[in-house]
Amino acid sequence: MSRKKNRLTGVDALNEAFDAVDHQPLLDHLGVDIQRDLLVLALTHRSFANENGMLPNNERLEFLGDAVLGLSVANKLYEQYPSSPESDVSKMRASIVSRYGLADIAREIDLGNHILLGKGELLTEGRSKDSILADTTEALFGAIFRQHGFETARDVILRLFAYKIDNASARGIHQDWKTTLQEELAQRKRPMAEYSATSVGPDHDLVFTAIVTLEGEEMGRGEGPNKKLAEQEAAHQAFRKLRESRA
């Protein structure tokens, strides 16, 4: 009996958190309607689900959306760059659908304010983490696919990623944010950025946190399953901050 009560309490908390935000602007950005149950699921991060009675979370939709995204972008690149070798279009796709590319799209549609996060993630600014933004974006694509089918999901994806796809060749076949940040600093005649990293968790499931500093000031922070990816995320945040400040 108490187990059922806890479950209902979790569902009530889920509905209350979801209804506290107007999600219509997000749907307007996407250009499609998503039925309530799918939208709730797509926006429910595992931290919220775990803190409220082990509710369903968006990871299965993320898995599905990742597949739809990959195929949509791969086919578009195949058509748009007919003379590029497989190795180049493969790297273009990897850059476009990377965590950083997805997080950029998420920020453009203000996705962070719509994600249902647990208290721990809220305290650590989870709404601005590239990993959470990227995963939730893929979950939304999965939800659109489930409701509307592949063609509609593909059209939404290609519209959101149009600029990145059109400029994939011009930007180069990969994006190394540490190099990009250093080039920006060199252009401004600023000193080199410095990186530090720590890890937590068991050996088989370590989570790395990297911090990039410039002249003693923290410019970016990133997380990842290894030091390299964490530093890339931190460098990406630092690059955006530098561009925004025009320091």
Curated annotation (Swiss-Prot):
GO molecular-function terms, A-Z: double-stranded RNA binding; metal ion binding; ribonuclease III activity; rRNA binding
Chief location of this protein within or outside the cell: cytoplasm
Cofactor(s) the record lists: Mg(2+)
Any one biological process term the GO annotation gives: rRNA processing
The EC number(s) this enzyme carries: 3.1.26.3
Assigned GO CC terms: cytoplasm
Catalytic activities: Endonucleolytic cleavage to 5'-phosphomonoester
SUPFAM superfamilies, A to Z: dsRNA-binding domain-like (SSF54768), RNase III domain-like (SSF69065)
Primary enzyme class: hydrolase
Residue intervals of the RNase III domain: 21-149
Domain DRBM: 176-244
Residue numbers annotated as active site: 66, 138
Binding residues annotated for Mg(2+), in chain numbering: 62, 135, 138
Pfam families: dsrm, Ribonucleas_3_3
InterPro entries: dsRBD_dom, RNase_III, RNase_III_dom, RNase_III_sf
Family: Belongs to the ribonuclease III family.
Function: Digests double-stranded RNA. Involved in the processing of primary rRNA transcript to yield the immediate precursors to the large and small rRNAs (23S and 16S). Processes some mRNAs, and tRNAs when they are encoded in the rRNA operon. Processes pre-crRNA and tracrRNA of type II CRISPR loci if present in the organism.
Subunit structure: Homodimer.
Record-given protein name: Ribonuclease 3
Source organism of the structure: Corynebacterium glutamicum (strain ATCC 13032 / DSM 20300 / JCM 1318 / BCRC 11384 / CCUG 27702 / LMG 3730 / NBRC 12168 / NCIMB 10025 / NRRL B-2784 / 534)
Lineage: Bacteria, Bacillati, Actinomycetota, Actinomycetes, Mycobacteriales
